[in-house]
From Swiss-Prot:
Biological processes annotated in GO: photosynthetic electron transport in photosystem II
UniProt source species: Cyanidium caldarium (Red alga)
Membrane topology label: Multi-pass membrane protein
Family: Belongs to the PsbB/PsbC family. PsbB subfamily.
Gene of this entry: psbB
The protein's name in its UniProt record: Photosystem II CP47 reaction center protein
Any Gene Ontology CC annotation: chloroplast thylakoid membrane
Keywords, comma-separated and alphabetical: Chlorophyll, Chloroplast, Chromophore, Membrane, Photosynthesis, Photosystem II, Plastid, Thylakoid, Transmembrane, Transmembrane helix
Cofactor annotation comment: Binds multiple chlorophylls. PSII binds additional chlorophylls, carotenoids and specific lipids.
Amino acid sequence: MALPWYRVHTVVLNDPGRLISVHLMHTALVSGWAGSMALYELAVFDPSDPVLNPMWRQGMFVMPFMARLGVTDSWGGWSITGESVSNPGLWSFEGVALTHIVLSGLLFLASIWHWVYWDLDLFRDPRTLEPALDLPKVFGIHLVLSSLLCFGFGAFHVTGLFGPGIWISDAYGLTGRIQSVAPAWGPEGFNPFNPGGIASHHIAAGTVGILAGVFHLNVRPPQRLYRALRMGNIETVLSSSIAAVFFASFVVSGTMWYGAASTPIELFGPTRYQWDSGYFQQEIEKRVEESLSNGLSLPEAWSNIPDKLAFYDYIGNNPAKGGLFRAGPMNKGDGIAEAWLGHPVFQDKEGHELIVRRMPAFFENFPIILVDKDGIIRADIPFRRAESKYSIEQVGVTCSFYGGKLNNQSFKDASTVKKYARKAQFGEVFEFDRTILDSDGVFRSSPRGWFTFGHANFALLFFFGHLWHGSRTLFRDVFAGIGAEVTEQVEFGVFQKVGDKTTKKQGYV
């Protein structure tokens, strides 16, 4: 009998041995992909400038996940923090990649073994010798094992008790490094930006899960509940597993897009809301004001701003600026950042200090408008053929730079002033090399954007998959043709009485 493509998985529905086999093969493929992808990323990754050319600008996808768990060094002698290292050993990018590839091979062999030796005594009821799985017991075993892993991660890996710790940084993504974390047991542990919550929540969830697993190993479900939720049917397992996966996928889509301690901006890039709210702009202005109050001059104050902080305050690093159909890393869009040119300050001939109104995230084009401190428009770059009374030439706008490569330089030429006004619309002004990667000048999204897009979409698909398989398992008797009038316990695929005249039915008067 030929099966259509969407029905092929029925061949493992009542075959536990081969069901294990295909799951082992799937895990082998995932592990092999992860290891191979890591090696590919290492082959194309340029570690030379961790400030202006970090991994998220280069479109690295699996490297940030390794880095946040404590893998920062390479056999090539470099570290993502910019230091040189020697003999990092197995706990390195290459070591983890090769470990995954070796694991993939072992899982592949295990899959073949289970496909060949599919009819194990383990899958038969010892009393009746009929094929049977004790699914509530299997659930208890899996819950205990996964909870032990969860508890161990929180209690040992994250805390540094037996492990490296995790990636910890300040609120502005400047001082990131691997360090151990103390669990946060108070209300502060519920702050998604508090890394202490990662440790405490894994310890708590692991503890609860271990207790729940022991419970399910020792306590049988009530018969009514067992039948109501079809606990003897493997499709119930599929349905509830899909529910767990899509829920987790929605959660991580949120923590990635909105930001959290588990998705640091140094590894995944800033969030769109940090551009929308002027998050980095406010911090830069605050630091400049503090420097000025300490007696420094304007050029000195701006020179104290780290390039890393200034680079975050640039619209090209906003993950919402990249279209979903623009493939490639951020560097393929605006180019490889080479230097911060400095902070441009504009002034008209009347002495008003002007700032360029910044482009909102969802605009592809936005008028170049220069406003004073009161928000009054003083100058602009008019559209072609438009009447102009605020043009750069008429208003006599000049541009001075503080900090960066052009520190303390001024420009009066109208074409140069216009050039920097256009750049200032995008935040802090940077110099990019677009020749190395043949960059096309069209913004791309960061790994933060791609991760969110992928997981939100798959979560939606899996949500419908949960409904589909849940309804199939709950209403299997109806779909199989066993009517409500049938009083004898019949199960499709077990008895041959479905539709049989001898099957007892409820009589009608």
